Amino acid sequence: MTQPPASAPPSGGRPAFLPNDLDPTVFDEGFLRQLERLLLLLKSPVRGGLKGGRRSVKRGQSVEFADYRDYAMGDDLRQLDWNVYARLERLFVKLFIEEEDVTITLLLDASASMASGTPQKLLFAKRAAAALGYIALASEDRVSLSVLAGRAARRRTGLRGSGRVFRLLADLSSIEPAVGPTDLVAAARHAAAQLTGRGVVVLLSDLLDPAADRVIRELAATGSEVVILHILSPDELDPALEGDLRLVDAETGDGVDVTADLGTLDAYKTRLAAWKASFADLAARRRASYVDLSSDMNLAELMFAELRRRRVIG
């Protein structure tokens, strides 16, 4: 008998625990059931400290036998199948299906610039983090949530098991944008220092920091698999501006006077495309995944189309 998701009310519809800032037209029972069929994909095997929900074939002891392979120098002699040796006079090591756990670390940029945009970038990031966190918890992966603000990463949540999704969403709902400047590089470095072992790190950020390329380098240097969800708002991607304007930095309060005309906007879009391409190139060189997004993207499209196409989930 199919059980309802841990988060779903018996009557179906919108789960009652979901915070108000999680769109009730998206986070319904059907959406959650679809998320439960997904996994965050790994490019290479990751060895966790506990048994979890991911199945991998490896040497060792487990409940389910998988296959044999030829013995190699250094293999554990206890895993040799002596019955096969007696028949074939060849040494084989037994392989088993073992379920591993993986830590999924969600790094949420809560700098002041993330509060801008329509729809707000931070709100989109929180919703995306909620969906990714739900996938991980339903897969019995461990989930860690850290907020990047100021010069530090504030670790909010370390969870495991689908029943802990309530705590994850409550923590996400309580996150507010920072007041004042955020040093994204320092915050990312602080977050990297808190990582234990290898896993998957997902950064949700607008990357509006003069040294944002160093953020990717810092995270990639941890040895974890890194996913960059680069979130910009529609008015940043295609600004509808004209005339004489004063643009004010959301974090520092510094302003600059500009005249917006067709030439200015064309130059802006050219530089924007080159800026995003530089992140994509850097991510590829560091074996990270880079996904550029607009904050007006439908969440179902993000989870079931875009991130699957980019092989982030599957």
Question: Where are the regions a protein language model picked out?
Answer:
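Short, contiguous clusters of charged residues that form electrostatic/catalytic patches at enzyme active sites
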Residues: 127, 131, 182-189, 277, ...
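Short amphipathic alpha-helical interaction patches enriched in hydrophobic/aromatic residues
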Residues: 114, 172-176, 287-290
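An amphipathic, basic-hydrophobic helix/alpha-beta surface used to engage anionic
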Residues: 2-159, 190, 200-203, 210, ...
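Von Willebrand factor
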Residues: 164-199, 211, 232-233
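Short, flexible loop segments at the rims of nucleotide/cofactor-binding pockets, characterized by
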Residues: 83, 177-181, 204-205
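Conserved phosphate-coordination/catalytic loops
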Residues: 123, 178-185, 270-273
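Von Willebrand factor type A / integrin I
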Residues: 1-57, 193-199, 209-211, 215-314
